[in-house]
Amino acid sequence: MGGNANGSVTTGAGIAGLGSPLILNNVIIRDNQSTGQGAGIYAAGQLLCTGCRFIRNISSANGGAYFTAYAGVELWWRYAMTGCYFSENEAIQGSAGYHSGYSWAYLGYNTYACNKATYGGTVSLNGTAYASKTTLVNNTFVNNRIEATGGVINEIKGGSAVYANLNAASTLSIVNNTIVGNHASCYKNGTPTADFYGAAVHIYNGTPFIFNNVIAGNRSTSIYTGDVYNAGQPATTGYNIFSSTDNIGITPAETDILGTSVDASILLLGNMLESNIVEGDIVPVLALNGGSIETVKVKRRFFGSNAINVLPASQFEEKLLKGDVDNTIELRDKLIFDQRGVERSTDGTSSIGAYEYGKGGTGITETTITTSPVQTYQNDPILYLSAAMVLQDVRIFSMTGSTVIHLGEVNAGETPVNISRLYPGVYISVSYTH
């Protein structure tokens, strides 16, 4: 907290990891400044962060909150940022995070708000040497900015939410995110540059799979796009909400929902999301809506006349999404929760975006279930389940949807569960009754 790297050492003002893995749980990293890469964290080895908060970390180079450094030609580890909060971080590229060398990464259940870059990317994903896989799932990007200055090559500038310059064979899976109210601009001598393509999601190279997202209401000084720009391989999309056809540089699928213009979509988003409209721009409101970090509440389930709770269960299969939504490497599972840890509906009424409409933080629909057959209490390191009836297939899930404890059938009465091996964090218990 409050570190400076501006002398002989210019990187990693908060934490400098020079090779060993960095595993951070529930750590606050704030108010660090560096003249080099990575004001909050500089990681030359593996970086795994869960439940951390990165606030006001400022780099004069790349990676305000964190910078991952890797120049090898073969991948030995993956990066994972899970359930973290990034706000008011600044850098040239990657105000929240900069992945260099390669971008085999899992970014899930995070919130990125009010970060600013002067070149590209709140999250900047880089590495063209070989193919990698990156998944962004159940994240919220709101009120982030790119403020670029016109130069020789302006096409590579952008990504007020996500910037990607990857190997052409690298997959970038963007799944069930809410990306709203972000701004990208590029001026030269006070005039918007004509060759600027800056968008909220800016893919300079790579193979994108874009499913189930709200990517709308994002502004840009570009005359070409504002929500999504893709100069990489053809994008595969489905069940997204976009501002309009002229605000995306991709071909939408039949299941994608589009507004008629950015201005019109901002009004529709203002009706759908907890937000304010200020001078014609949407400013989503973040709050603790039942999860461990701030999210944007869906207050109405319609984008204009289009319902947003239309996702079939098949739309959460990893094989379709081409993304590792539960951070287990293998593409054989499915997305189970929203960003808060609320269980998603499987009856064809799940919601587009990071927030499952109509469900509270417990994952129980408030209008249909008012009591639970299971009560819990903890006496470290034992969690006690007290059930009035036999429970079937009792599981405890992490926030990423991975099963961390599988109890199977549990009899009525009190059942002790040893949770000493679990990291501190938020977990969800799911059970079934006859």
What are these regions (language model features)?
Residues 250, 345-353, 408-413:
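A short acidic/small-residue loop/turn micro-motif
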Residues 365-432:
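C-terminal outer-membrane/trafficking sorting elements
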Residues 9, 15, 21-26, 41-52, ...:
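Predominantly extracellular beta-rich ligand-binding scaffolds that present long acidic/polar faces
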Residues 12, 159, 198, 331-332, ...:
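Short coil/loop residues immediately preceding or within conserved phosphate-binding loops
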Residues 305-362:
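Surface beta-loop-beta hairpin patches that serve as ligand-binding interfaces in beta-rich domains
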Residues 1-14, 31-33:
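Beta-strand/loop edge motif enriched in small/polar residues
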